[in-house]
């Protein structure tokens, strides 16, 4: 089993990660709260402070990107490479209504053709490792088979699965049966 510190917006900032890493059992990976691509040349002050290697000493930090726009994703990857990052995580798991209403996070999962085109482009053009955090669907666990088929087409660094659909947020029974079949489908 691998131990990772999942991102929680507004909580697991570099200050929290640094304190945790110093005083508790270090995690194998730490994920940043999601970065949303924007057109500015660089990250804003909060984002920059969160990803600066000097603020995250000794940690295997993976910046997380939340978008449904391949160009925005690729532009953000280029900015992150400037800070020395060679791995990013694509957030396809966020269930927040404000995120989902824009077709991002788990809101992207229902648009399988667009998702497949998006992944085609980012995996063809990005020269970093890309992992994906996903849910098993937006409305129903039956969506998982198609999502897994799509993911299997790409050289994912790893697939991190939250075994719930977007509609469940963080409540209800998990779809752990989907996960049991995950290794068979990969």
Where are these regions (language model features)?
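Flavin-dependent oxidoreductase catalytic cores
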Residues: 1-186
């Amino acid at each position: 089993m691998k131990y990772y510190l999942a991102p929680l917006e507004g909580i697991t900032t570099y200050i929290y990660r640094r304190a945790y890493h110093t005083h508790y059992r270090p995690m194998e990976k730490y994920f940043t709260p999601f970065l949303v691509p924007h057109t500015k040349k660089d990250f804003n002050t909060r984002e920059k402070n969160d990803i600066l290697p000097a603020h995250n000493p000794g940690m295997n930090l993976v910046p997380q990107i939340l978008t449904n726009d391949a160009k925005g994703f690729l532009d953000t990857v280029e900015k992150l490479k400037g800070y020395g990052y060679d791995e990013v995580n694509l957030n396809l798991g966020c269930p927040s209504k404000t995120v989902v209403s824009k077709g991002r996070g788990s809101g992207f999962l229902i648009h399988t053709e667009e998702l497949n085109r998006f992944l085609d482009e980012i995996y063809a053009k990005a020269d970093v490792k890309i992992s994906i955090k996903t849910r098993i669907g937006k409305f129903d666990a039956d969506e998982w088979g198609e999502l897994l088929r799509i993911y299997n087409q790409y050289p994912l660094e790893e697939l991190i699965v939250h075994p719930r659909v977007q509609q469940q947020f963080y409540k209800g029974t998990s779809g752990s049966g989907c996960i049991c079949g995950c290794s068979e489908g990969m």
